[in-house]
């Protein structure tokens, strides 16, 4: 059973965004990363795409969802500050979960750069995919 835990693509810096941080969008680099993630993640047999409801996470996986014809589902368990509530989501074959750095750390104890991902087999990290 293979799943992918993805940290959202580049979205600039929190302190540079004057509005509600949940609405912070991807920057130019992040938009490029999100487009490149399509080919990077296509080989993993993606059947379901889940995302934190934060704009930067949704935007990270929108190109993947569109390219694969898979519905993008927002899930609050992947939102910043939700802790390890999303652990059960990673126990589904073919799921991509897009989230934030603090959630990645809570779930697998790792630290990913923006746009990078961990590939998991039966809930255990087996590989890191560097950010495009």
Residue ranges and their predicted role:
Residues 83-129:
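Active-site-adjacent alpha-helix immediately C-terminal to a catalytic or transition-state-stabilizing loop
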Residues 2-84, 110-118, 132:
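Active-site-proximal alpha-helix that buttresses catalytic centers in soluble enzyme cores
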């Amino acid at each position: 059973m293979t799943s992918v835990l993805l940290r959202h693509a580049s979205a600039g810096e929190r302190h540079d965004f004057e509005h509600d941080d949940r609405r912070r969008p991807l920057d130019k680099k992040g938009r490029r990363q999100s487009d490149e993630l399509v080919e990077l993640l296509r080989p993993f047999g993606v059947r379901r795409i889940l995302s934190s409801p934060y704009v930067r996470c949704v935007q990270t996986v929108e190109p993947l969802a569109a390219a694969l014809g898979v519905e993008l589902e927002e899930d609050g368990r992947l939102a910043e500050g939700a802790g390890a509530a999303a652990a059960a989501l990673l126990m589904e074959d073919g799921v991509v979960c897009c989230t934030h750095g603090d959630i990645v750390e809570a779930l697998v104890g790792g630290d990913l750069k923006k746009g990078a991902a961990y590939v998991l087999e039966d809930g255990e990290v087996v590989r890191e995919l560097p950010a495009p």
